Amino acid sequence: MMARRDPKSWAKRLVRAQTLQKQRRAPVGPRSPPPDEEDPRLKCKNCGAFGHTARSTRCPMKCWKAALVPATLGKKEGKENLKPWKPRAEANPGPLNKDKGEKEERPRQQDPQRNALLHMFSGKPPEKPLPNGKGSTESSEHLRVASGPMPVHTTSKRPRVDPVLADRSATEMSGRGSVLASLSPLRKASLSSSSSLGPKERQTGAAADIPQPAFRHQGPEPLLVVKPTHSSPEGGCREVPQAASKTHGLLQAVRPQAQDKRPAVTSQPCPPAATHSLGLGSNLSFGPGAKRPAQAPIQACLNFPKKPRLGPFQIPESAIQGGELRAPENLQPPPAATELGPSTSPQMGRRTPAQVPSVDRQPPHSTPCLPTAQACTMSHHPAAGHDGAQPLRVLFRRLENGRWSSSLLAAPSFHSPEKPGAFLAQSPHVSEKSEAPCVRVPPSVLYEDLQVSSSSEDSDSDLE
């Protein structure tokens, strides 16, 4: 009987049994997991739900077929007002409706008053109201347009004048004719009519009464420079610089009642070129060429003399008055002078080249001074090729005009530098001319302080 069975039919049955088992395993609907599989400490990274991980088959992100989609609940037509009601026309309106009607009638009653005011300011004839009630809206349409301010025409009042010009009388304004040359062109035109009312009056005390301009210049207010002229018989007419009209706010109004507070401007001649030669701290004054002068009294016009330039062998007077003598540093000491050691003298001290003042600078007061006349010797140490040279003798003399003169004197051979008395015995003519005893000074000090050159004889003749 086993042989009679077909193997193909048996295989078909096996396949059917396997497919049925697969269909039973597949989830038909949303299956609730067993309680032992849920763990609240786990969280899925895909859907963010707790109880399973991202690799679990329970995640709805992996099986979209099992996910539930929220169904639409349909339209709610009852909440939408598809057929709004029309307002009812009540025959007997309530108290609220009466108040609304009164508010609508009030602006209509105010229309005639508004039209009358518009007619006064604008000068337009009042428009007749239209039967449909649009006249009130059209009359006020020009007020809603963004335009400039409405001009107010008043014929009874005159335009307001400058307060400074208003409180001036006609006699005060007549005296401004002498100052019209320094005013701006606009001020000239405004004051020309007022100055022609009365005759010109000559003022002798202070500057003319000038109206203060509407704008003021920041900073100190400059004064008015008045120069007297010889052509006027009374000496009261003054000239004002023409360049003063270029600056704004140059003229300041000097009222009669405020003269006790501000001093009057005195007329004194002042050189116009004094501003170029004044230094710092001096009072400045302006002339015709000044653009913006500073406020300063006119009397203090000082012209300081220029500082004279000194020649290479001239000594400043400040050093002569204090009894100080300084030599200009024009030469460098020879290398032979550095062979001697440092030595000091009672009348001349050793100084460094940094302490030796130059001719152009002001010498310090800490330098040593020399007597009125003194004859000094300076042993010349030549180079190796010049042996047996004679020492140099210099005679300093003070002249009558306050200057110093130096001269070189010829001296015999000097073999013993340690004995200064022998030198005085050999040169008697030097001791007669000198007013102080001669003191031997080391050559190193003389080279640094005096710096005597071979051309000093020529300079002596020039100074005398």
From Swiss-Prot:
Annotated InterPro entries: FAM90 (IPR039213), Znf-CCHC_6 (IPR041670)
Coiled coil: none
Biased composition (Low complexity): 180-197
Compositional bias annotation for Basic and acidic residues: 74-89, 97-111
Start and end residues of each stretch annotated as Disordered: 1-42, 69-387, 410-437
Membership in a protein family: Belongs to the FAM90 family.
Protein name listed in UniProt: Protein FAM90A7
Gene from which the chain derives: FAM90A7
